[in-house]
Design a protein with these regions (language model features):
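Charged docking surfaces used in two-component/phosphorelay signaling
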Residues: 140-208
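N-terminal Rossmann-like NAD(P) cofactor-binding subdomain of oxidoreductases
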Residues: 1-163
Length: 208
């Protein structure tokens, strides 16, 4: 989707990187995909979770580095959470790892704020936090982008919209696990009428 297109656009500008392209006719052919993956140095997966897991299963070349933008491997054993800002050693860990899971958009903002506070003991791991996260509509994929950029766009889309308020959002698992929290935060994701960008707010009580 949009993530893959952005990565490709940025890499095309680099003279030190050669992109391996699959014939569009064979993009869903597992043999053709496996060939491309295994002759690469680095493969980015910008796929739904199930498809990402299937793609990882195609890897036979141990030298291939997989960077997965889906939620499939963010808390999985054997995968490095790709947020170098977490510690002074994290950058080298991400660089050397053969399996890197890209943080979710909401989760990345939350983890960046909360992880150091828990790590330093300022916020106890047992606390139940709340988080409000505003995001642009591009994160919703092609369908949502089309809705927001349509000439017949509903007036209702001009205001921020909450969604996923049942505490089942796919980013909650990594928010909790990476920060070492014992309880999932109460999460309010909100999509807004701008293309991309994030604003993440985590209120803290003075008694902490």
């Amino acid at each position: 989707g949009t993530t893959g297109l952005r990565i490709a656009d940025r890499l095309k500008e680099r003279s030190d990187v050669k992109l391996i392209e699959i014939d569009p006719e064979f993009r869903k052919d597992s043999s053709a995909r496996a060939e491309c993956i295994n002759k690469s140095d680095v493969t980015f997966l910008c796929l739904p979770d199930v498809a990402a897991k299937e793609a990882v299963g195609l890897v036979t070349n141990k030298r291939v580095k997989i960077i997965d933008a889906s939620t499939a491997h963010r808390t999985a054993d054997g995968w490095t959470y790709g947020l170098p800002e977490l510690s002074k050693d994290k950058l080298s860990e991400v660089c050397s790892a053969k399996r890197v899971a890209v943080p979710g958009c909401h989760a990345g903002g939350f983890v960046t704020l909360v992880y150091p506070l828990v790590k330093c003991g300022i916020v106890p791991a047992s606390v139940v936090l709340s988080v409000f996260s505003l995001t642009g509509y591009s994160g919703g994929g092609k369908k949502m982008i089309a809705e927001y950029e349509s000439k017949e766009k509903s007036v209702l889309l001009s205001a921020p919209r909450q969604y996923g308020l049942n505490q089942q959002h796919k980013h909650l698992k990594e928010m909790t696990a990476v920060c070492g929290l014992k309880n999932s935060p109460v999460f309010s994701p909100i999509v807004c009428d701008f293309y991309s960008g994030m604003e993440v707010t985590v209120p803290l009580d003075r008694s902490l």
